[in-house]
Swiss-Prot record:
This is UPF0210 protein OEOE_0945. PANTHER family: UPF0210 PROTEIN MJ1665 (PTHR37560:SF1), UPF0210 PROTEIN SPR0218 (PTHR37560). CDD domains: RNR_PFL_like_DUF711. It comes from Oenococcus oeni (strain ATCC BAA-331 / PSU-1). InterPro entries: UPF0210. The lineage of its organism: Bacteria, Bacillati, Bacillota, Bacilli, Lactobacillales. Belongs to the UPF0210 family. Homodimer. Disulfide bonds: none annotated.
């Protein structure tokens, strides 16, 4: 092997913030459905501990063997709304606490899948599960939630959009941090290893290993070597860098699966930033040529970055999946925070950026007095982008009681610090209150 390639890999880890962001075990809980919530909860806890008992130990051993940091060890499970048909509200709470306790018992960082898929309609159990979010997200430590309210095939469930906006307001009144643990999706994927939106799809194996890589700092350092070169050279440099990053993810994921006796699922190529300087997607975009992220040209630069990441990744692995692109969470990215404080980056610009990247309006703090209908309308706008363009979009928005524009909130750790961003004050209430269903686009009709 070329010694320069070895040195490059060492430098990626030691100087450029490269890491495996997550090794996530997906576990099907469909065989855990019991006669009531209590029995389902007991079966859920037993299966998770049985399947994932050695996940953390195995990942830590691979960290030592290869010197590659694995930041998070996580679990995703079957959407809980599919398990809880026989449960009442108290039964749902018992299942939630069993999931949280199982995650703690096996030592993982997070467990995702307290979720509902309601893009076309909602069952009584699904409505009850959403109603439980304020209590569940404020009383559990490791549990993550998601809702899928739209898809290209189904259109947008505006009733669910309205209910979700009201639920987000209720969560914020109990604990604003609870909304950092809830993602609202259009076109959610079944094999996403990243939180808070991970769940284990019904078409997946009984248990599987998925990996999420991360390397904004590696991409930024690579682009520093091609300053003043044409944009074609920039795209090629990102592509070759993504190839190297993905190969490491493929290696770690495959070995983890082999050691645990499970099938290997996918590598998610997403560039996931952290609040640390030098580990920022915004800084990558600025290295492409923007004075500050959010200025004119940002959407074009992000499209280039996202596309080149995908092209490099699919050359490195046959098993690419999840969201696979660039994440733009405001509170988790030092460059995004700077641009927000400077007034360069707005919610409207972030919405435009989501049309060409992996996710959506992510980790955005807004004034505590924002109406629920405005939050619902933000979700509807993001869903429209995803539905029309046949891609995943999402919203993770955090109303902060008592805070207004100019203030900020510090979530700590990887969640970072969020400046309070302004929202448009004109009302969307009449639109959201119409309810019903926004039809699927004509191009979704393919049969």
């Amino acid at each position: 092997m070329d010694i320069n390639k070895i040195n490059e890999t060492i430098q990626m880890i030691s100087e450029e913030h490269f890491d495996i962001r997550t090794v996530t075990m997906g576990i099907s809980l469909l065989d855990c459905i019991g006669g009531d919530g209590q029995r389902t909860a007991e079966k859920v806890h037993r299966k998770i501990v049985d399947k994932a008992g050695k996940l953390v130990e195995t990942a830590q051993q691979l960290e030592r063997d290869f010197g590659v940091p694995i930041v998070n060890k996580r679990i995703s499970v079957t959407p809980v709304s599919l398990l809880a048909g026989n449960a009442d509200y108290d039964g749902l709470i018992k299942i939630a606490r069993a999931l949280d306790q199982a995650a703690a018992d096996v030592g993982v960082d997070f467990l995702g899948g307290y979720s509902a898929l309601i893009q076309k309609g909602s069952t009584p159990t699904e409505k009850m599960l959403i109603d439980s979010f304020p209590e569940v997200l404020s009383t559990t430590k490791l549990l993550m939630s998601s809702i899928n309210i739209a898809s290209t095939k189904a259109g947008i469930n505006l009733n669910a959009v309205g209910k979700t906006g009201r639920t987000i307001k209720r969560i914020s009144e109990v604990d604003p941090l609870g909304n950092a643990k809830l993602v609202v999706f259009a076109n959610a994927v079944e094999d996403n290893p990243f939180m808070a939106g991970a769940f284990h799809g019904v078409s997946e194996d009984d248990a599987v290993i998925n990996v999420g890589v991360s390397g904004p700092g590696v991409v930024k350092r690579a682009l520093e070597t091609v300053r003043d070169r044409s944009i074609d050279v920039v795209a090629e440099k990102i592509k070759t860098t993504a190839f190297k990053i993905t190969r490491i993810g493929q290696l770690i994921g495959g070995l983890t699966a082999k050691k645990l006796g499970l099938p290997f699922g996918i590598v998610d190529l997403s560039l996931a930033p952290t609040p640390a300087r030098g580990d920022s997607v915004a800084e990558v975009l600025e290295e492409i040529g923007l004075e500050q992220v959010g200025t004119h040209g940002t959407t074009a630069a992000l499209m280039l970055l996202n596309d080149a990441i995908k092209k490099g990744g699919v050359m490195a692995s046959q098993r690419v999946g999840g969201l696979s692109g660039a994440f733009i969470p405001v509170s988790e990215d030092a460059g995004m925070i700077d641009a927000t404080v400077a007034g360069t980056l707005s919610i409207s610009k972030l919405e435009a950026m989501t049309s060409v990247c992996s996710v959506g309006l992510d980790m955005i703090a807004i004034p505590g007095n924002t109406p629920a209908s405005t939050i619902s309308a933000m979700i509807a706008d993001e869903a429209a982008i995803g539905v029309q363009n046949n891609k995943t979009t999402a919203v993770r928005v955090i109303p902060v009681p008592g805070k207004s524009v100019g203030d900020s909130i510090d979530f700590g750790g990887l969640l970072g610090r969020a400046p309070i961003m302004p929202v448009i004050e004109k009302s969307s209430t009449a639109f959201i209150n119409r309810g019903g269903h926004i039809p699927a686009p004509i191009h979704s009709f393919k049969n």
